[in-house]
Regions:
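N-terminal export leaders
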Residues: 14-23, 27, 31
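N-terminal pre-ligand scaffold of iron-sulfur
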Residues: 318-377, 404-427
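N-terminal secretory signal peptides
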Residues: 1-14, 38-41
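Glycine-rich FAD pyrophosphate-binding loop
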Residues: 79-101
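Helical element adjacent to the flavin cofactor pocket in flavoenzyme catalytic cores
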Residues: 257-323, 414, 426-433
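N-terminal Rossmann-like FAD-binding beta1-loop-alpha1 element of flavoenzymes
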Residues: 59-85
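Mobile amphipathic helical/loop "lid" adjacent to a hydrophobic cofactor/ligand pocket
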Residues: 125-126, 130-131, 136-251, 260
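C-terminal segments that line or cap access tunnels to active or ligand-binding sites in enzymes
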Residues: 437-439, 444-584, 589, 595-597, ...
Length: 651
């Protein structure tokens, strides 16, 4: 095996370079690692004293946001006797793993925000799965493929019990692209790259690399094959584009998914939609412990008093039906002299020059963004997905939509943004409900957390406001799901990452994964294929029609057998709300605990004390928030698990 390592790291590697870069201790750590001994998860939080597991006095908490982070916090707190009230603005719980019904012809399906892989090193997420006894809701996808449009052979990742360096050895043995990597460890720059990707430490890695974007970091003599094969596709799978992603954050991401991960890159999917498979059992557990879960409610005020959160006020319904103001940024890519547009993705608003009202362009049929259509005889809006047509004032002209587009009052302008409020709500009864609690967990996404702080009444800690203001969302993502009248042969994994296409970053065969879709495929002989764009540039695809048309064109490139197939239905999800991790954002990123002793944050956007990503980051942040409350109440904290928090080659 030592010969394999020698061949991988270069036959002519100078001993003095290695010793200078890694030190004797680092080399000892590398060589002493045993392939036969799988590293066990690191326990991040474990109380040494035996403390009570339940709160000893009545304790209340309000959790704002019903995504994975908020659900995890509410679940753990409700298990410990805390009286929890969970508020969620959407009709569905789950955030980015929410599910909702759609109509496809005469049949109903559950739609999602795109396929999510449940990786085996999601230790905290799977600890909840075990406690809820819902292991049967997940299925292994056996292996994971990464397919390139040009030049390179596919890469295949399988389950593993080996961490670094043996997972690198295994990859070098299995990859037919290994001679394309372009690594030469006698080259100082390449040695430095190797040092960074194998020696992640927090905060030292961020101190070196957080001020650089990934694009900047790889722009100076970086191994091209290594970038094309692994860094580019995996960087985009963080849902952040390399040109606006911190290089330090990417090192954390790589450590969690590969260099510090002894489980391999094969993963599970859900047997049904993620709502039924994971979200619903979590909600049922919260409610079984007395928790109150409210959906379709909008927070209208956050009261502050004496440096603490004093309470929140909410109203029933979304922003469409209640008088809660909100801000939205101008979209320069869509705006013209004849019409201004604000927002992005599936939350876009049009404002005519000088108008005091705005029109929501969210189709009332199934949530797509309608497109402006101007002809010689009429002007209006058309849904690119299902053909619903609206007049210029938002009135329905043709189905399948049955309700008019929503209208909003323009309350004020501030630079390139406007403040809107639902119009025509004066006669609609909507009672404000006040909530007070001992603790508040804000677990909304970044647009949501910014909206909560904009609704503050009272004096807020300035440093906290600064932290929230600097948060940024990533470039938008898009998911196109296509129902077709024929099946096709596919030699790769049922979820496959793709690289080299203008828009598409992955393909998922739903008629091979989820039970309802499998049954439909068996019954009809058709297929259901999902294409996912993780972080596209709006200037390249300014409208949803552009996105759908490009998805469909690339589908026939990816699966030539589908040329000539009939598209029975196509469904689009297009949002701009994923957490951004731009250069320079690490130092001032909010953590779970705040300077306000009754306020906690949770979400995939918070600064974490150990490596984690995506769903595991959301769940872990929620459990950390719950632990902070439990600790303040003198209650046993939940042990939090992680991969090895530092790289083997510590620097």
């Amino acid at each position: 095996m030592s010969q394999s390592i020698e061949g991988l790291f270069a036959q002519t590697l100078a001993r003095r370079h290695v010793l200078k870069l890694f030190g004797v201790g680092g080399i000892a750590a590398l060589l002493s690692y045993s392939r036969l001994s799988k590293p066990q998860p690191t326990v991040f939080q474990r109380d040494r004293l035996e403390l009570p597991t339940q709160v000893g006095k009545p304790t209340t908490a309000v959790v704002i946001g019903g995504g994975l982070a908020g659900l995890a916090a509410a679940y753990e707190l409700s298990q410990r006797g805390v009286a929890v009230t969970l508020l969620e603005r959407s009709p569905q719980l789950g955030g980015k793993i929410a599910s909702w019904p759609i109509q496809v012809g005469e049949e109903s399906f559950m739609m999602e925000h795109g396929f999510h892989g449940f990786f085996p090193q999601y230790y905290n997420l799977f600890s909840l799965v075990d406690e809820l006894s819902i292991q049967q809701n997940f299925k292994s996808l056996d292996y994971y493929s990464l397919v390139y449009k040009d030049h390179y052979d596919p890469e295949v990742f399988r389950p593993s019990n080996s961490a670094f360096p043996w997972n690198i050895v295994d990859l070098a043995i299995s990859s037919s692209n290994r001679l394309e990597w372009g690594i030469n460890l006698t080259h100082l720059k390449h040695l430095q790259v190797f040092r960074e990707i194998t020696g992640f430490r927090n905060p030292q890695t961020y101190e070196r690399l957080d001020q650089l974007s990934v694009t900047e970091w790889v722009g100076n003599d970086f191994p091209k094959g290594l970038y094309d094969l692994y860094f580019l596709p995996f960087a985009k799978s963080s849902l952040n584009s390399p040109d606006v992603l911190s290089a330090g954050e990417l090192m954390q991401f790589f450590h969690f998914y590969f260099f510090g991960n002894p489980e391999g890159l094969a993963f599970n999917g859900t047997c049904q939609d993620m709502g039924r498979s994971l979200v619903d059992p979590m909600v049922e557990a919260i409610q079984a412990n007395g928790g109150q879960v409210l959906t379709g409610v909008t927070v209208s005020q956050v009261a502050w008093q004496e440096g603490k959160v004093a309470g929140v006020t909410y109203q029933n319904g979304s922003v469409v039906v209640n008088p809660v103001p909100f801000w939205v940024d101008r979209n320069p890519l869509l705006s013209s002299e004849t019409m201004e547009y604000f927002g992005a993705g599936d939350s876009v608003y049009s404002v005519a020059p000088g108008a005091k009202t705005a029109l929501s362009l969210t189709c009332t049929h199934q949530g797509c963004s309608v497109q402006r259509q101007v002809t010689t005889t009429a002007e209006g809006y058309l849904c690119p997905c299902h053909g619903a047509a609206y007049a210029s004032d938002g009135a329905v002209l043709a189905g399948p939509a049955r309700e008019n587009l929503a209208t909003f009052e323009v309350l004020q302008r501030e630079g390139d943004r406007i403040q809107l409020m639902a119009a025509n709500v004066d006669g609609v009864p909507n009672v404000a409900h006040d909530l007070t609690a001992d603790y508040y967990v804000m677990a909304a996404d970044i647009p949501g957390i910014k909206a909560l702080f904009s609704l503050s009444d009272g004096e807020v800690e300035p440093a906290l406001v600064s932290q929230i203001d600097q948060l940024q969302v990533a470039d938008p993502f898009a998911v196109g799901r296509f129902w077709l009248d024929r099946d096709f042969d596919w030699q790769h994994s049922w979820f496959t990452s793709l690289s080299g296409y203008r828009l598409t970053d992955s393909i998922t065969l739903y008629h091979r994964i989820q039970d309802d879709y499998i049954a439909w495929g068996d019954r009809t002989g058709g297929s259901v294929v999902e294409l996912h764009a993780y972080c596209y540039k709006e200037k390249d695809f300014p409208t949803q029609a552009d996105i759908l048309d490009t998805f469909e064109a690339e589908l026939y490139e990816i699966v030539p057998e589908l040329k000539g197939a009939t598209v029975l239905h196509r469904q689009l999800v297009n949002q701009k709300n994923f957490a951004g991790f731009p250069p320079g954002s690490f130092a001032n990123r909010p953590q779970t605990a705040t300077a306000v002793n009754n306020l906690l944050f949770a979400g995939d956007w918070v600064r974490m004390p150990f490596p984690c990503g995506l769903m595991e980051r959301a769940v872990s942040s929620g459990l950390l928030a719950a632990n902070a409350i439990l600790q303040r109440e003198g209650v046993q904290r939940r042990p939090i698990l992680s991969v090895n928090p530092e790289g083997v080659l510590k620097i």
